[in-house]
UniProtKB/Swiss-Prot annotation:
Belongs to the FPG family. DNA binds at residues 91, 110, 153. The active site is at residues 2-3, 58, 262. Monomer. Keywords: DNA damage, DNA repair, DNA-binding, Glycosidase, Hydrolase, Lyase, Metal-binding, Multifunctional enzyme, Zinc, Zinc-finger. This is Formamidopyrimidine-DNA glycosylase. It comes from Lactobacillus delbrueckii subsp. bulgaricus (strain ATCC BAA-365 / Lb-18). Binds 1 zinc ion per subunit. HAMAP family: Fapy_DNA_glycosyl (MF_00103). The gene is mutM. The lineage of its organism: Bacteria, Bacillati, Bacillota, Bacilli, Lactobacillales. Its cofactor is Zn(2+). It holds the Pfam family H2TH. PANTHER family: FORMAMIDOPYRIMIDINE-DNA GLYCOSYLASE (PTHR22993:SF9). SMART domains: Fapy_DNA_glyco, H2TH.
Length: 273
């Protein structure tokens, strides 16, 4: 699933492609890609102009004046620019057809991604957005906020970071990375972390998100930005996807277990309970 650095990379590459373009019409080839009524989605967007491409955590927010399209890419969602009359691929589910003849298409092999049309200003009432914590690497993600939030929660730190309720934007890849960097066992209850561990984890989260965004995100499966380019942060990964390989810090082989239903790779020596 694209995490915050990947979605931010998509946002940055989409912005010059669509901002200022006016929608002539919308074609929907898979109705379930829309949360709500597809006909209303098409009717309300006709004649609207893309003004801003925003993002919160893993959600894209397309601003069109008084309306906003909330887009969650989920596992495999991708956007790319083409033309109205380009052949429709079987994995393409929607297009915003612009008055200049170009078209922004949404493709999704797994069909898990969703788009929802809402009034601008109400987007944080959307399911998925309304319960998110503050964004990682944002001014709101202060150390004192993080410390207080961790003290109130007894679930293991891996599950908490994956839940998005305290800090939003991290997924399986970056959670494994920041826990390894901080030498924290993923099964440690959040409220048992020491002050030093919390400080190290807070720094690791901010630094990793910033660096991963700088490298255009991580492509380990199929992630591509809106220009069709892959990310490069996979070349920097230290632990994710490296089960059985030696830890670059101590030489002990990484192990993999399941936590909250997700594969979790860590070092038994460096990340002791």
């Amino acid at each position: 699933m694209p995490e915050m650095p990947e979605v931010e990379t998509v946002r940055r590459t989409l912005r010059p492609l669509v901002v200022g373009k006016t929608i002539d019409h919308v074609d929907i080839w898979y109705d379930k890609v829309i949360t709500g009524d597809p006909e209303t989605f098409k009717r309300e967007l006709k004649g609207k102009t893309f003004t801003v491409v925003d993002r919160y955590a893993k959600f894209l927010l397309f601003r069109l004046g008084d309306l906003t399209v909330v887009s969650h890419l989920r596992m495999e969602g991708k956007y790319h620019l083409t033309t109205w009359d380009a052949p429709v691929d079987k994995h393409e589910h929607l297009q915003f057809a612009f008055t200049d003849g170009s078209s922004l298409r949404y493709a999704d092999v797994r069909k898990f991604g969703r788009l929802q049309l809402v009034e601008t200003g109400t987007e944080f009432q959307v399911t998925g957005l309304k319960n998110l914590g503050v964004e990682a690497n944002s001014p709101e993600f202060r150390l004192d906020y993080f410390e207080k939030g961790l003290k109130k929660r007894s679930m293991n730190i891996k599950s908490l970071l994956m839940s998005q309720t305290l800090v939003a934007g991290l997924g399986n890849i970056y959670v494994d990375e920041v826990l390894w960097q901080s030498r924290i066992n993923p099964l440690t209850p959040a409220n048992e972390l020491t002050k030093d561990q919390v400080k190290q984890l807070h720094s690791a989260i901010n630094e990793t998100i910033e660096e991963a965004t700088k490298y255009g995100g991580t492509t380990v499966h199929s992630f591509l930005n809106a220009e069709g380019g892959a990310g490069h942060y996979q070349e920097k990964l230290k632990v994710y996807g490296k089960e059985g390989q030696p830890c670059p810090r101590c030489g002990e082989d990484f192990v993999k277990i399941k936590i909250c239903g997700r594969g979790t790779t860590y070092c038994l020596h460096c990340q002791k309970r």
